[in-house]
Amino acid sequence: MKPTSLLLAATVLMSTPITSALAASATPPDVAKKPHVVKAPHGAERNDEYYWLRDDKRENKEMLAYLNAENAYTDAVMAPLKPLEDKLYDEVVARIKQDDASVPYRERGWWYYARFVTGKDYPVHARRKDGPGVDAVSIQAANAAGDFAGEQVLLDVNALGAGKDYYNVGDYEVSQDNRLLAYADDTNGRRQYTIRFKNLDTGELLPDTVTNAEPNLVWSDDGRTLFYVDKDPETLLSKRVKAHVLGTPASQDALVYEEEDDSFYMGIGRSRDDKFICISVESTVSSEMRCTPAASPGVFTVLAPRERDVEYQADHLGDRWVIRTNADGATNFKIVTAPTDSTSRKDWKDWVAHRDDVFVEGFELFDGFSVVAERANALESLRVIKADGSSDYVKADESAYSMGLSANPETGTDWLRYSYTSMTTPATTYEINTKTGERRQLKQQPVPGYDASKYVTERVWAPARDGKTKIPVTLVYRKDVARDGKAPMLQYAYGSYGASMDPNFSITNVSLLDRGVVYALAHIRGGQEMGRAWYDDGKLYNKINTFTDFIDVTDYLVKEGYAAKDRVAAMGGSAGGLLMGAVSNMAPEKYKVILTLVPFVDVVTTMLDPTIPLTTNEYDEWGNPEEKGYYDYILTYSPYDNLQAKAYPAMFVGTGLWDSQVQYWEPAKYVARLRDLNTGKGPVVFRTNMEAGHGGKSGRFRQYRERAEMFAFMLDQLGVASK
């Protein structure tokens, strides 16, 4: 089938991309080469002529001048595409119900929700008192009508962020007596949060502040003490749990627990029944929990001592602990139980058995039933286990989708709330009665002008080069796009840390689909879509599989006619940016343009430096290059080290000056060396957000503006431009 006239009217094929023509005549910034040798403990040495671009304080004038010059060059190259960028941005904003609100949930006698104000970037967090006739449906109706009588505003993030280039509230927590609020905010994207306090009875901000913290907060039962996670100011590792007593200086906060092993990170939370406050410490391959009674916090007692290659996460309800673990060879995890006062491994009793073909992702406990989040064949499912031991699965409506637990703070209910979405179905919140099976839709993300019937999503399986592995791929495209090998395609993947990339609806992607672009989400190894073995096959000495899987998916989709071989774009960020750098080195001819955001591209140098944030947490993900074997293996794929004098695709590289996860100098060095070696004609542009961190700019509209610029660059390179 040929594209309809509507689609053709929105598509123009150009022989030479505007950005390529302009980049050929423009001159990118000069960047000095300065000799520097990076040494490894085992004696290996590497030259890094752009190492000088690193400045931990972000103050070096020569470095800042270079980043600003790169931004100016990007502005110049992108200037002719400003009308397209504006059009893309306007299209996305038009798909937003700007005064939308979340589905309220009830907790301790109050209904909590977030709502947006038309034209504003940030949410308003609010609550309403429970009472006769007050429920999620009535509150949604009131919010939609602009009726905020009886609402108590917890945080107006627009007011808090006013005048700031960057602002983010990472977490907030209401005290058990509902009177006090603690919240954590970040003003530069570095993820070093400041904790602040508010009296909800008076609306007064209290003078107490705690700096350099994680957005992870737990109140004691008496509402006088807040437990929080303190960060190391240099490595940004979550190192200590402290207790702040209101009305006292933060310098006097008591040390509750300190983790000595830098390969672990930590968090703190309450058990499901609020009886315990628990500290969780985890590495890539091990975990340990320590808990204390919430009513009288004291010594945090270890549930089960840490063991290498044994992970567990526990929760408590009633008279037992319920524990998800991979102990005893349960590669895909199982669920066990233990008595409240006997939690060592010898006391664990199997409850949900391990299965080779089903990955147990998590669980939620209720008084009359339990829910297990599972994954099989790269699809999520929710299994409801009833008190009598029987079980049912929550039904999905499509063949490729995403399903997960939603807010369920109360245990004494028969109703389970969950979320559902797909690449064609906007985010939807349902609740299902676990006794009767009745399902109610509480909300679907409103998308003005969107017609789901015009699009199709499907799941295909691409063969990997090993001849035995099948890689799941989720596709979405307009129904009037022919599978004739002529369409442009954007292929996205991540493939690290066991993070599963599930198919979600995207209002920004609709603008691509309406221009005839096929969108492909590749569920490659290194993620956990197919279970723990899928992750293990894409890390450490198996990391190369992540990159070859991505390339093999591209080859398959082109072979099957989903895309033209010369009109393929690739996109990834962070560890997915490592993926982009690797595939551009391994198979540059297969990609017309690559979009790489906050890319982790200098793996060896970063992993050799324990002072860089996250390095020590990740030795079991990439390997420790202080060991010669890992050093040599990482060198085979590290993007910065494998750049060569050859033709590379056009590339859009983005970073944030204050990025805490991938330091800005990695993409800066990468772009400098790439430009020096690249023999291709495609432009390389480098955008640094000078006020942003790993997640980009804050605020919903500014993020859409960033995406519009990047997509305008990509569409131009693919030969697609809007009239």
Curated annotation (Swiss-Prot):
It is an enzyme of class 3 (hydrolase). The active site is at 574 (charge relay system), 659 (charge relay system), 694 (charge relay system). Keywords: Aminopeptidase, Hydrolase, Protease, Serine protease, Signal. Its EC number is 3.4.14.-. Optimum temperature is between 35 and 40 degrees Celsius for the hydrolysis of Gly-Arg-pNA. Stable for at least 30 minutes below 20 degrees Celsius. Pfam families: Peptidase_S9, Peptidase_S9_N. The keyword Hydrolase applies. Nearly completely inhibited by 0.5 mM ZnCl(2), 0.1 mM N-tosyl-L-lysyl chloromethyl ketone (TLCK) and 0.1 mM leupeptin. Strongly inhibited by 0.5 mM CoCl(2) and 0.1 mM chymostatin. Activity is hardly affected by general serine protease inhibitors phenylmethanesulfonyl fluoride (PMSF), diisopropyl fluorophosphate (DFP) and N-tosyl-L-phenyl-alanyl chloromethyl ketone (TPCK) or by aspartyl protease inhibitor pepstatin A or by CaCl(2) and EDTA. Belongs to the peptidase S9A family. Sequentially removes dipeptide units (NH3-P2-P1-) from the amino termini of peptides and proteins. Is able to catalyze the removal of Asp-Arg from the amino termini of angiotensins I and II. Has slight endopeptidase activity on N-terminally blocked peptide derivatives which contain arginine residues at the P1 position. Does not hydrolyze Ala-Ala-Ala and Ala-Ala-Ala-Ala substrates or insulin beta chain. This is Dipeptidyl aminopeptidase BI. The lineage of its organism: Bacteria, Pseudomonadati, Pseudomonadota, Gammaproteobacteria, Lysobacterales.
